[in-house]
Swiss-Prot record:
Cellular component, GO annotation: cytoplasm
Family of this protein: Belongs to the TRAFAC class translation factor GTPase superfamily. Classic translation factor GTPase family. EF-G/EF-2 subfamily.
Taxonomic classification: Bacteria, Pseudomonadati, Pseudomonadota, Alphaproteobacteria, Caulobacterales
Keywords noted in UniProt: Cytoplasm, Elongation factor, GTP-binding, Nucleotide-binding, Protein biosynthesis
Protein's recorded name: Elongation factor G
Chief localisation class: cytoplasm
GO BP annotation list: ribosome disassembly
Organism: Phenylobacterium zucineum (strain HLK1)
NCBIfam families named among the record's database cross-references: EF-G, PRK12740.1-5, small_GTP
């Protein structure tokens, strides 16, 4: 079927927030008022439409980003639900990559919270235009002005209210629309579906005038004509104000602030109007960049049906009815079912079996999709998160890849029976395909299966999925830290491998210079061979030997990182040399670093932020110091104190329960991986003794 909406009428947006700011409730209300949900799902009773994995319904947090299509005022909305829990920032990054705009939801009582900052910074990285919805204005202690202030202070963003609340806490009646200078008041009986315009209450008139002037002054700055008219005393029309606010959102000049209470059904329709009026369509954002598959030159793809097809797979989910679903954003061109595609990231062929339009948990089969659409494809075999799909015959392209953070925490899993062993293998490969920040490996020595993730909650949920969805019974080890190793000295190692016992022998000599690298540089290999001391075809053998040797460590079997190896000299034999011989030689040379390279143990250091009421400050800081934490600074946020610290991950296990106990459940914390650092000698000796 032909296109039903012009691409200019699309709004691909996500809703981002701190955990518990009311993001899922806001999404639910949007689906309810746009007519896509027949009953309102409440997170409190575990019934929200978007949160459709059992684990999410129980924990009341959103884990997977489900994509949903809805309609409002003749525009087509594709809503991507993003998780707000810090263990799932990978999901947030992934959904930000495919969004054109976002609504940031704040809790009117708390303002900007730690995870708000995290997702805001990620949105800055991808230059996502945003509007802000201050939610929960019906809550005790909700304070709109303070929330707006927190956006300025904590995010350093220019916040310009375009609405004000009427009443607060339980007396919240509606909002003042500063663009139209009208009060919008909701009828409490009709589940928020009925509302009407009224005159602005007398006691708020002055405040509204001042807020409107501030809004207009900031808006007209973006348009010379409007600015001139305003300076000569002419009041801008509603149309001009909207045009200027839209420009501000697209350029990031300022962020419009709206307010309401999704739970009490107030303020959601004006929020939808703002999404339509101010957030970008696919043609308002810069063309997406990519690399030509054949020439490797940079190319651009405009959001148009006439351009060659380019599609980004941003999420893979296992669906109980359809099997594996790959959520995709079509950046350009037209996609049809039955089409043969090329996965240009992996140079593999794919065929589109079924194409579905998702409404959080119902699905609609479609035959065609166009630039700007977000669809789920069934039946793809080779595609992983972050891969590009395109037309093999029309200038295939690789869109920019997404970068995923290192998993820093691991647990061992042992299946309880032979039958579980088989189920475990299948389940884990599916989970790893769905989530690039979750990796599965086998410990060569113990034969155990090792799962690595971003945090305790991340791994808990994976284990939960194994047990519930895949019915795997397994014994779970205690969480372990993903230590790493490195070297501290520059050293030259000359190693000759020869094995000549009649018949074809083996011979290879390598001279390698090893030196410590910058933190985060990983492993760098370079060949500085001149004059053919080691023929070109054997150099990959040297690199391969080092690649495999570094995985087994020097001290305690942890991968070696942040070093450079340069092949400077060597020797070969016409008959006895081979790629394998050079691989064995470089592997043996690497092992000598144990004695000569000053090996050291590294541990992951987490950036921890604790928000605690003043009275527990002493105990919290004392406790962090006891965990080898380095306090980086503290701030006031309302009447709470915010402590920032670097703490080794090894000392953060079970911290959530400790902190609760210490603060009677009133303090919270978030942590993100920051960097690797050398482990103090005393601690290192214990770790090496345990693992070596």
């Amino acid at each position: 079927m032909p296109r039903t909406h012009k691409i200019e009428d699309y709004r691909n947006f996500g809703i981002m927030a701190h955990i518990d700011a009311g993001k899922t409730t806001t999404t639910e209300r949007i689906l309810f008022y746009t007519g896509k949900s027949h009953k309102i799902g409440e997170v409190h009773d575990g019934a929200a439409t978007m949160d459709w994995m059992e684990q999410e319904q129980e924990r009341g947090i959103t884990i997977t980003s489900a994509a949903t299509t809805a309609f409002w005022n003749g525009k087509r909305l594709n809503i991507i639900d993003t998780p707000g829990h810090v263990d799932f920032t990978i999901e947030v990054e992934r959904s930000l990559r495919v969004l054109d705009g976002a609504v940031t939801v704040l809790d009117g009582n708390a303002g900007v919270e730690p995870q708000t900052e995290t997702v805001w910074r990620q949105a800055d990285k991808y230059k996502v235009p945003r509007i802000v919805f201050v939610n929960k204005m019906d809550k005790l202690g909700a304070d709109f002005d303070k929330s707006v202030e927190s956006i300025r202070d904590r995010l350093g963003a220019k916040a310009v209210p375009i609405q004000l609340p009427i009443g607060a806490e339980s007396a919240l009646r509606g909002i003042i629309d500063l663009v139209r200078m009208k009060a919008v008041v909701w009828d409490t009986d009709a589940l928020g579906a009925k509302f009407q315009d009224e005159e602005i209450p007398a006691d708020l008139k002055e405040k509204a005038e001042a807020a409107r002037n501030y809004m207009i002054e900031n808006a007209v700055e973006l348009d010379d004509e409007a600015m001139e008219a305003y300076l000569s005393g002419e009041e801008p029309s509603e149309e001009v104000i909207k045009k200027c606010i839209r420009k501000a959102v697209l350029t990031g000049a300022f962020y419009p602030i709206l307010c309401g209470s999704a739970f009490k059904n107030k303020g959601v329709q004006p929020l939808l109007d703002a999404v339509v009026d101010y957030l970008p369509s696919p043609v308002d954002i810069p063309p997406t960049k990519g690399i030509d598959f054949r020439t490797e030159e940079e190319v651009e793809r405009r959001a148009s049906d006439d351009e060659p097809l380019s599609v980004l797979a941003f999420k893979i989910m296992d669906d109980p009815f359809v099997g594996s679903l790959t959520f995709c954003r079509i950046y350009s061109g037209k996609l049809e079912t039955g089409m043969g595609l090329m996965n240009s990231t992996r140079d593999k062929r794919e065929r589109v079996g079924r194409m579905l339009l998702m409404h959080s948990n119902n699905r609609e089969d479609i035959k065609e999709a166009y630039a700007g659409d977000i669809v789920a494809l069934a039946g793809l075999k080779e595609t992983r998160t972050g891969d590009t799909l395109c037309d093999p015959n029309k200038s295939p392209v690789i869109l920019e890849r997404m970068e995923f953070p290192e998993p820093v925490i691991e647990i061992a899993v042992e299946p309880k029976s032979k039958a579980d062993q088989e189920k475990l293998g299948v389940a884990l490969s599916k989970l790893a395909a769905e989530d690039p920040s979750f990796t599965v490996s086998t410990d060569h020595e113990s034969g155990q299966t090792i799962l690595k993730g971003m945090g305790e909650l991340h791994l808990d949920i994976k284990i939960d999925i194994l047990k519930r969805t895949y019915k795997v019974e397994a014994n779970i080890g205690a969480p372990q830290v993903a230590y790493r190793e490195s070297i501290s000295k520059r050293t030259e190692i000359d190693y000759t491998h020869k094995k000549q016992t009649g018949g074809t022998g083996q011979f290879a000599r390598v001279k390698l210079v090893f030196e410590p690298g910058e933190p985060g540089s990983g492993f760098v290999f370079e060949s500085a061979i001149v004059g053919g001391a080691v023929p070109k075809e054997y150099v990959p053998g040297v690199q391969k030997g080092l690649e495999s040797a570094k995985e087994n460590g020097l001290l305690a079997g942890f991968p070696v990182i942040d070093f450079k190896a340069t092949l400077v000299d060597g020797a070969f034999h016409d008959v006895d040399s081979s790629v394998l011989a050079f691989e064995i030689a470089s592997r043996a040379a690497f092992k000598e670093l144990r004695e000569k390279g000053g090996p050291k143990l590294l541990e992951p250091i987490m950036a921890v932020e604790v928000v605690t009421p003043e009275e527990y400050l002493g105990s919290v800081i004392g406790d962090l110091n006891g965990r080898r934490g380095q306090i980086q600074g503290q701030d006031m946020r309302g009447n709470a104190t915010v402590i920032n610290a670097f703490v080794p991950l090894a000392n953060m296990f079970g911290y959530v329960n400790n902190l609760r106990g210490m603060s009677q459940g009133r303090a919270q914390f978030t942590m993100l991986f920051s960097h690797y650092e050398t482990v103090p000698q005393v601690v290192a000796e214990e770790v090496i003794k345990k693992y070596a």
